[in-house]
Regions:
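Sec-dependent signal peptide cleavage junction
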Residues: 18-34, 220, 340-351
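Active-site SXXK
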Residues: 30, 43, 49, 71-99, ...
Length: 351
């Protein structure tokens, strides 16, 4: 039976953020998404360092699956925030410097004598996107580390360091490789040692830890159907981690409480307001006067957003394994609900 699109504006009384987040309005919004097959995912909201809202939506529309509150989502490039934190921990420990040249580790990479660790972190290195070759994604099936490294060298650079900001997956693969050189262990072991154990995370894992109970990717064509996504072992340190939304909020809250890195290091991670959109592992997300810092992640079927507002100590973690309208619209509406502002429900085609 076709569901009619609810074409109306949702008005919420009040204009200022209150200490109590309106869970009923959040439920109404997610009920609308769910009823219209708008997405499949999970939402967690933290306020003052603890969870005040958690809900999954849409999963019951999936055929022949089992899931629970511990089922993980692929968080795609939110993984890069973790990699940046790990690199900056090395900086704090004096084991590497932001101005260390890439040539100290991989002199065979083009322009490595000019590219610094800082350039790699902030997407100003000039390196490209190893995952796309000849205009197509070629990491759908498992490839070797050598294949990836050869592609990075072949693509080279498209501009000189610091000339501009261009998002670079290749830069973060290299940062992961540098981490493994410095620690003399694989990325998933570093994540376990430096992130998972200190924060007592239950449902957070890099792909080589073989995480179980993880959602597959889906696409909607009259119904939700499983689709093939990238091979996550090809993007370790770039987009391979799986997590619950709750564990993601624990991480970003702990980050802004200076439990993972020092305050001055966190300030370095953040983009400079008025000058940058991208920092060194954190990006700026503006929703009117409300400023959040965090990271986004998108692959073929999975999408994730993790953002934190330092002023109000609010964090929003949102992951999907199937969606039919842009995540930025979804999250903007969530922010409007939290701050008691007017917004328009997204139009979702019915079949």
């Amino acid at each position: 039976m076709k569901l009619k699109l609810l074409a109306f504006l949702l008005f919420i009384s009040g204009n200022l953020f209150s200490q109590e987040i309106n869970k009923e309005n959040l439920d109404d919004y997610l009920n609308y998404i769910e009823a219209n097959n708008g997405g499949i995912g999970s939402l967690s909201i933290f306020k003052d360092d603890h969870e005040v809202y958690n809900r999954s939506f849409g999963q019951e529309k999936l055929p022949n699956i089992t899931f629970n509150q511990d089922t993980k989502y692929q968080i795609a490039s939110v993984t890069k925030m973790i990699t940046a934190i790990l690199i900056l921990q090395l900086v704090e420990d004096g084991k590497i410097k932001l101005d260390t040249k890439l040539s100290d580790f991989y002199p065979e990479i083009p322009n490595s004598q000019k590219i610094t660790i800082k350039n790699l972190l902030e997407h100003t290195s000039g390196l490209g996107n190893f995952a796309v070759r000849n205009g197509a994604i070629w990491v759908m099936d498992k490839v070797t580390e050598k294949d990836i490294f050869d592609e990075i060298k072949k693509q080279g650079v498209t501009f000189e360091p610091n000339e501009k900001v261009v998002y670079s997956n290749s830069a973060y693969i290299i940062l992961r490789m540098i981490l493994e050189k410095k620690y003399k262990k694989e990325y998933h072991k570093i994540v376990e040692q430096k992130i998972i154990k200190p924060l007592s995370l239950r449902d957070f894992a890099s792909v080589k830890s073989n995480p179980e109970n993880t959602f597959k990717s889906y696409k909607f064509t009259e119904s939700w159907n499983e689709i093939k996504d990238i091979e996550y072992s090809n993007v370790v340190g770039v987009g391979d981690i799986a997590s619950t939304t709750k564990d993601l909020n624990i991480i970003i809250t702990s980050l802004f409480q200076n439990k993972i890195i020092k305050k001055e290091t966190l300030d370095l991670m953040k983009p400079i307001l008025g000058k940058e959109d991208w920092g060194r592992g954190l990006a700026l997300f503006e929703y009117g006067e409300n400023l959040f810092f965090g990271h986004s992640g998108d692959v073929i079927g999975c999408h994730s957003r993790l953002i934190y507002n330092p002023k109000d100590k609010i964090s929003i973690s949102y992951s999907t394994n199937g969606e039919r309208f842009p995540a930025n619209i979804f999250v903007e509406n969530l922010v409007n609900i939290i701050y008691s502002k007017e917004f328009k429900l997204p139009e979702i085609k019915t079949f």
